[in-house]
Amino acid sequence: MALAGLTLFLSPVAQAQDNALPDFGEGNAVPLSQEYYLGRAWLMQFRRQAPILSDPQLQDYTERLIYDLALTSQLRERRLEVVLVNNRTINAFAVPGGVVGVHNGLILAAGNEAQLASVLGHELAHLSQRHFARG
């Protein structure tokens, strides 16, 4: 009985130590060499159309948080561009080439830095796993 309880207790601990993301194979819809340029072209267009939030302090804070997270991520390319969107919805997104968009609604809704970091880490995982390049 005690052994069964110990097994149940240790199982989540062992699972938590294995933090590798699943590998669904290489994306081939967009070559890695073109991602950066596609992302920057998309970003130029996006900035012309979307309500961009211009807040230097918030920009610096968000960039610092994302760059800190990127240090321990599986990203091959760490040239990241953070764009703050003036939108009250709770949302963030990732675009090829290291573009991460963050709605100010997400920042306002986050109860603390850890909650915001978890969403930003999720977006970095989209980039590292190249989900957009899978067609």
Regions found by a protein language model. Give the residues of each.
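Peri-catalytic and regulatory segments of divalent metal-dependent proteins
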Residues: A16-G135
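N-terminal signal peptide c-region/cleavage motif recognized by signal peptidases
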Residues: S11-V13
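Bacterial N-terminal signal peptides
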Residues: A2-F9
